[in-house]
Every structure is written in C-alpha cells, then in structure tokens.
Regions:
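Residue-level detector of Asp-centered blade-edge/turn motifs that repeat once per structural unit
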Residues: 124-126, 169-170, 214-215, 254-255, ...
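Hydrophobic beta-strand positions that form the internal "hydrophobic ladder"
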Residues: 130, 174, 216-219, 259-260, ...
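Blade-level signature of beta-propeller repeat domains, shared across WD40, Kelch, NHL, RCC1
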Residues: 357-386
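Short loop/turn segments that connect beta-strands within beta-propeller blades
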Residues: 87, 146-150, 190-194, 231-235, ...
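A flexible loop/linker signature enriched in serine peptidases of the S9 family
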Residues: 123, 134-141, 157-160, 177-186, ...
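Amphipathic beta-strand/beta-sheet edge segments enriched in Tyr/Trp
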Residues: 50-114
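Conserved beta-strand position repeated across blades of beta-propeller domains
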Residues: 166, 211, 251, 294-296, ...
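Short beta-strand->alpha-helix linker/helix-N-cap micro-motif
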Residues: 1-56, 66-70
Length: 386
C-alpha cells in the first residue's frame, strides 16, 4: 500500500522540532509494519488555500495520504492528523492529540496503530513494549524498550544469569528465571502500580523458561527437566511430564488448553504438544535439533515459532500445532533465536548474531521485512508486551 506522509504544517507558523517528530515516528512505524510503501511527499504542493491536490498525489502513485497540522502553546502540542483515500478523495480517519513534548512519540504510535487497523484490519502494535535481557555471562539484567528500540529502561539489578522473560497478556507482570540466589529460580516482576519483584521458587533445583498462561491464572516452567504448572504465587506446582527425558521451554496455546514444549525423549530435542494437564503428548517436528518454541497468541494465526539448529547456524521456523505447514523464516545469517510473537500474532521479535554481535530484530510472520531494533550487542531473550 503506497502511503504518502508529508511533514506536519504549523498552524501558528512557528517551527517546533518535537512536534515534527510525530511524522518521523509515524513513517518509521509504517515502514516497520512491512505492509506499506512510505513516501515523504516532498515536491507535491498544496494549493494556495491549503486544501489537498489529490490529483497531484494520485499522479505520484499515492494510494493513501496522511495530512497533519500542529500548534504549540503553553508547553503543550496539539496535533491533528487525517488519513485519506487518494483515488476516492475520501476522508477515512481523523485523530486529534494534545501532548507534552515527551509524549509526541506515543501519540504518533497511537495514530500509526489506527491507520494500520483502518487499512489492513490488523491491530497496530506500535504502542507495545519489548522486554529483553542485556549483558553477557553472569552479568545480565532485564530491560524494557518501545517496540522500535527507543526509550530503553532498566528493570532489574540482578547482575546474574537472568534468562527467558515472559510478559503476562495484560502487560503488567513479567516472569523470568535468575540465579541471583544460588540456583536458577523463577521470579515475577510487577510493573504496576510500582515495580516490585517476588521470588516464586526456592528449591536448589534448575527452574527456568517460565511462561504465563493466556488468562494469567497459571505459570508453566521447567524444573530439573520436567514441565511444571503452578499458581501465580508459586503454590500448587504440578509435574505434567514425569519423564526420564529432558523436557523444557513450555509455551501455552491461545486458549490455555495445550502446551508446546521441547523434549529429547526421541533422542534429540524436538517440539511436542500436550494437553495442559499433561495428557495426549504428541511430537510435531522432525528436524535435527529443534528448540525454543513460542505459540502465537492469536488463533487466527495459530502457529508455533521455534528454532532449528543447523550446523553453526540457528534459524527460526513456524509450524502449525498439528505438525503441518512448516516454514523457514530466517536463513544464512548467524544464529537466530528466542522468537516471541507480537500481541496480535502478526509479527515476531527475535535475537540474532547475523552482524556479529547479538541484537534484537523484528519481522513479519512470514519472515519478510526483518529489521534490527538494537545495534550495540549483548541483547537476548526478547519478549513482546502490550
């Protein structure tokens, strides 16, 4: 979809760089979606009255046009933006925002999400967050950033082997594992009303790869090579697998009725699916070494992303829960690991060493439009949050 996004027009005539950031963020959001061909519309004039010369935009190849204006007053910025269908010369969508200079990016993300919903029917993810691990070895901590890699904030001070964060479906809590106190244990970090951390497991065992159930009522995790499910406070833990094999990395289906996980019960690690009570276990992959599953939160997509180790490389695949329709999303580019789905199930964030250092990337669910979010290395285990 060809979208032209001219700079905002100042109503009062004065230039405000923070207000102009709105368009920069908006253009970047639409590019990151991978569904739009975005243009800045330079050289296409408005007529003298300030109305839109639709014919000029149509001749330039525009299908959609976003036009906006702003006014700065008293330390606040008022922004009005509209989406037009160029061929029909039709007003499709309009939004107005009043923001402090520090909130202009948030307003742009909100408008980009509204535009994406209007043009594609897909909920925009531009106001979402990505939580990730930064650091190496025994000096790792949890951070949060905007989905586009901006506004990075540190969440923990563990300086330990911190691994596998996962956000609750409402985005208010993060579960992860850390060896901050002796062995790997499960922790929960609450983000509202304030940042508060609780340790859920306390045994001298290997507790890792936790994940919230979709309704937030349970946490699945692995302990010493078995899959367990507990209440959010760590009580009532139940062993689902009781297997002599190593079973790790549980991930819930969108309705919470099934769990996919990794097991080497067949000789090498493969992806299996079972009911959430541990019954009806079946294998769904047959590659050489498959691990790190992540089930899409959207039944409309209903795919499981996973990692297949292929020699010195590791690549991300998707597969249907019944073991059909396997697709390779990354190829020939280092180690691609830790896939995590966007809340709408149409995008995947992941970690990759394709350029040497390990950084966070995003891509569309079919593997197209792979784009880096970080560039300074030492980043791993991204998890998408609302």
């Amino acid at each position: 979809i060809s979208v032209f996004v001219p700079d905002l027009t100042s109503v009062g005539g004065s230039r405000d760089e923070k207000a102009l950031e709105f368009v920069d963020v908006l253009r970047n959001d639409l590019l990151n979606a991978g569904l739009f061909d975005v243009h800045d519309a330079k050289g296409i004039p408005l007529d003298g009255s300030g109305s839109i010369n639709f014919q000029a935009f149509f001749n330039a190849g525009a299908e959609e046009l976003i036009k906006g204006e702003y006014q700065s007053s008293g330390g606040r910025i008022q922004i009005a933006a509209r989406l037009f269908d160029v061929a029909q010369e039709k007003d499709l969508l309009g939004r107005s925002y009043e923001a402090t200079p520090g909130k202009v990016r948030e307003a742009a993300h909100r408008f980009a999400s509204a535009v994406m919903k209007e043009l594609t029917g897909i909920d925009g993810f531009f106001n979402s967050k990505i939580v990730f691990v930064s650091g190496t070895g025994q000096n790792r901590d949890l951070y949060m950033m905007d989905y586009d890699g901006r506004d990075i904030k540190r969440l923990t001070s563990h300086r330990s082997l911190l691994l596998s964060p996962h956000c609750s479906s409402d985005g208010t809590k993060i579960v992860f594992s850390s060896d901050k106190v002796w062995s790997q244990n499960i922790y929960v970090l609450s983000l509202v009303p304030r940042i508060e951390e609780r340790r859920l497991t306390r045994a001298l065992k290997l507790d890792q790869s936790p994940e919230w159930s979709p309704d937030g009522s349970k946490i699945a995790y692995s302990e010493n090579g078995d899959i367990f499910v507990s209440n959010p406070n760590g009580s009532g833990a139940v062993n689902l697998t009781h297997s002599p094999a190593i079973d790790v990395s549980p991930t819930w289906s969108p309705d919470g009725r099934e769990i996919a996980f990794v097991s080497d019960r067949g000789g090498v690690p493969q992806i299996y699916v079972m009911n959430s009570d541990g019954t009806n276990v079946r294998r769904i992959t047959s590659g050489g070494y498959d691990t790190d599953p992540s089930w899409s939160p959207n039944f409309g997509v209903n795919k499981i992303a996973f990692v297949r180790v292929e020699g010195s490389e590791a690549n991300i695949f998707t597969i249907s829960p019944d073991g059909t329709d396997e697709q390779k999303l990354t190829r020939g580019a280092g180690r691609n690991e830790n896939p995590s789905w966007s809340p709408d199930g149409h995008y995947i964030t992941f970690a990759s060493t394709r350029n040497g250092a390990k950084n966070i990337y995003i891509m569309y669910l079919n593997g197209e439009n792979q784009r880096p979010l970080t560039r300074d290395g030492g980043k791993s285990f991204p998890t998408w949050c609302r």
